[in-house]
Amino acid sequence: MAKGHRPRRGSLAYSPRKRSQSHIPRFRSWPESDAEPKLQGFAGYKVGMTHVIMIDDVKHSLTEGTEISVPVTIIETPAIRVAAIRAYGKDTYGEIAIAEAWTDVLDKDLSRRLKTAKNPDVNASLEKLETLVESGRANDIRLITYTLPSTLTGVPKKVPDVMETGVSGSDVKAKFEYAKTVLGTMVEISDVFDNGKIVDVAAITTGHGTQGPVKRWGINLMKNKHSRQGSLRQVGTLGPWTPAHVSWRVPQAGQMGYHQRTDYNKRILKMSSDVDEVNPAGGFVNYGLVRGNYILIKGSVPGPSKRLIRLREPTRSKVSSIGEPQIMHVSTQTLQG
């Protein structure tokens, strides 16, 4: 007898499944925090995956206190520069950017991404921001940062990736004072996160172009009788006669991949600059060798190698850190096949 249970194939939660507008993922919210002001996010470039041998520190686990093998993702994280301070106010429709103050210490490569002012009056811009903060019109302070991929050999581009990053804290004045101290400076990932820290990871997934409904949605193949008529990898029906239109819920061919996805509560197992501990013989496939600061994230992250990966303080975690993990060994076995 046939089963009476047949859930739909594929999730409608991410519809419409269309290409991301940019390869830079965007965080639409930042966690509220009463901690000291500092950057709430960072960015790096995906290198590849390997595995580590570590001591299981999950309480009440069956393997607690013993060595276990854990898959990890390597992300190269060169220093980022703080280019500007942005103040937000509120209007009828919500938050709106009301003022910015750009530094005059900008890298030459930034002109490849956007048009920069030749002689910005930094002091005048900061005075305007300070007036908005003192008057209470500015209710939030964020920083505009950018990466420098030209310092990496594994990422074949020179154009920086510009993004907006939140600042922790509840006092707007304290956040503004912190922003003034880091404006125009280079920030390392060690200034933002620690070993064992829980973070949210966002990236643009690997693109697969146009795919059919079987691969895109996971529907079943048609039976042999239909395949002889040329209908093997198609949906059984597009819908009823009435209403006389095709519903958006019907699985159809279209774009697959290159969507923004966010992984919540990923753990940073290690942050280091000792590249000999992770570089395999022959380098990583489609990337090469790690030559600077890097981190090891437990598990996988979205996107292919060389893809920009953004990190953020967790928004849905009950704990912000589990403690520093004890790593016994990092596999450097060649990945060349």
From Swiss-Prot:
Annotated region (Disordered), positions in chain: 1-32
Coiled coil: none
Molecular function GO terms recorded: rRNA binding; structural constituent of ribosome
Signal peptide: none
Record-level GO BP terms: translation
InterPro entries: L3_arc_euk, Ribosomal_L3_dom_3_arc_sf, Ribosomal_uL3, Ribosomal_uL3_arc, Ribosomal_uL3_CS, Transl_B-barrel_sf
GO cellular component terms, semicolon-separated: cytosolic large ribosomal subunit
Keywords: Ribonucleoprotein, Ribosomal protein, RNA-binding, rRNA-binding
Subunit description: Part of the 50S ribosomal subunit. Forms a cluster with proteins L14 and L24e.
Family stated for the protein in its record: Belongs to the universal ribosomal protein uL3 family.
PANTHER family: 60S RIBOSOMAL PROTEIN L3-RELATED, LARGE RIBOSOMAL SUBUNIT PROTEIN UL3
Biological function: One of the primary rRNA binding proteins, it binds directly near the 3'-end of the 23S rRNA, where it nucleates assembly of the 50S subunit.
Annotated protein name in UniProt: Large ribosomal subunit protein uL3
Species of the source: Methanococcoides burtonii (strain DSM 6242 / NBRC 107633 / OCM 468 / ACE-M)
